[in-house]
Amino acid sequence: MGDTFIRHIALLGFEKRFVPSQHYVYMFLVKWQDLSEKVVYRKFTEIYEFHKMLKEMFPIEAGEIHTENRVIPHLPAPRWYDGQRAAESRQGTLTEYFNSLMGLPMKISRCPHLLNFFKVRPDDLKLPNDSQVKKPETYLTAKDGKNNVADITGPIILQTYRAIADYEKGSKTEMTVATGDVVDVVEKSESGWWFCQMKTKRGWVPASYLEPLDSPDEAEDPDPNYAGEPYVTIKAYAAVEEDEVSLSEGEAIEVIHKLLDGWWVVRKGDITGYFPSMYLQKAGEEITQAQRQIRSRGAPPRRSTIRNAQSIHQRSRKRLSQDTYRRNSVRFLQQRRRPARPGPQSPDSKDNPSTPRAKPQPAVPPRPSSDLILHRCTESTKRKLTSAV
């Protein structure tokens, strides 16, 4: 596995929050080396403290010793009071700042200080509580405006999807979509809930309600891995459809196919079936509080349960049947259990005509008797024999 680093940082906009008091946070889309994209929220005061620490770590590059050596960009200090106008006008500065940082040598652009600052925190995953009196106000950067998301840090282009059916949000953290609505997907969570934006709205939408505009097949779905990855169930689930599997909490299983809609194909012995990825945890890892908050939303609906789905594509997305999964899984397990074939030094190889054989050694002739020597050998040999006797 290669080193962890950040490919791109894009500023999506900012939020005006009212808990515990009124303040503003900036919303960043961070693309990591494994092409995963995460949304994080940071206050400007946090960003400025990060900037000061970065200058202390690299005083030469910060121009603290010689001004002409400065390569770390300048960042103005926060004001005593930051209003909405200041938060909005500062977006251009932040865009240029992080764009410059990502273009610096790797000892700066990939330093642990930068990576740790943009790692997902529990607060980044903690969605607003439906019981809050006043919800956060979100101000997204216009796609055709000055701070185009695609121009912030290189080739970050939000993928566009279309809703195949009406979906009514179940909480304030989700987003309602109608059939035919076009949304930009900001984050694809393994849980099957995707964070989307549509004009000035944003929220979580089940991936099963969305289809790519270009083709009916989800190209990002990986191929099945019949070797399996060990996972443990952290929540019981009773199968509803025939191709699903029922499991209790704490059962050890193997994941053989991870699908983006949040319904993974798992294997328990020789049995395979769909199971919600939200109720799974990698074996040997502890579940975090942030993951508990995501899983509390519940498993997303499956595509097969959506009524009146209207796709713009003539052919539907291809999905393997459970019979195919089961057959391929059994074949793989049989091959894994089968003993290895004997090597070239095995006893069977001596019957193989293609195997090279060693040349036989000549037999040692018996020693001739004394009478034979006296009758057939030379006079010299006879004298030696006579003297020896």
UniProtKB/Swiss-Prot annotation:
Residues 292-389 are annotated as: Disordered. Residues 373-382 have a biased composition (Basic and acidic residues). GO terms for molecular function: phosphatidylinositol binding; phosphatidylinositol-3,4-bisphosphate binding; SH3 domain binding; superoxide-generating NAD(P)H oxidase activity; superoxide-generating NADPH oxidase activator activity. It is a peripheral membrane protein. Phosphorylated by PRKCD; phosphorylation induces activation of NCF1, leading to assembly and activation of the NADPH oxidase complex. GO terms for biological process: cellular defense response; cellular response to glucose stimulus; cellular response to testosterone stimulus; defense response to bacterium; defense response to fungus; defense response to Gram-positive bacterium; epithelial cell proliferation; hydrogen peroxide biosynthetic process. One of its GO terms (cellular component) is membrane. It holds the Pfam family PX. PROSITE patterns: PX, SH3. Keywords: Cytoplasm, Membrane, Phosphoprotein, Repeat, SH3 domain. InterPro entries: NADPH_Oxidase/PX-Domain (IPR051228), NCF1_C (IPR015039), NCF1_PBR/AIR (IPR032136), NCF1_SH3_1 (IPR035756), NCF1_SH3_2 (IPR035757), P47PHOX (IPR001655), PX_dom (IPR001683), PX_dom_sf (IPR036871). CDD domains: PX_p47phox, SH3_p47phox_1, SH3_p47phox_2. The modification Phosphoserine is found at S304, S321, S329, S346, S349. It is found in: Cytoplasm, Cytosol; Membrane. It comes from the Eukaryota. Residues 4-125 form the PX domain. Subunit of the phagocyte NADPH oxidase complex that mediates the transfer of electrons from cytosolic NADPH to O2 to produce the superoxide anion (O2(-)). In the activated complex, electrons are first transferred from NADPH to flavin adenine dinucleotide (FAD) and subsequently transferred via two heme molecules to molecular oxygen, producing superoxide through an outer-sphere reaction. Component of the phagocyte NADPH oxidase complex composed of an obligatory core heterodimer formed by the membrane proteins CYBA and CYBB and at least the three cytosolic regulatory subunits NCF1/p47-phox, NCF2/p67-phox, and the small GTPase RAC1 or RAC2. Part of a cytosolic complex composed at least by NCF1, NCF2 and NCF4. Interacts (via C-terminus) with NCF2 (via the C-terminal SH3 domain). Interacts with NCF4. Interacts with CYBB. Interacts (via the second SH3 domain) with CYBA; interaction is phosphorylation-dependent. Interacts with NOXA1. Interacts with ADAM15. Interacts with TRAF4. This is Neutrophil cytosolic factor 1. It comes from Rattus norvegicus (Rat).
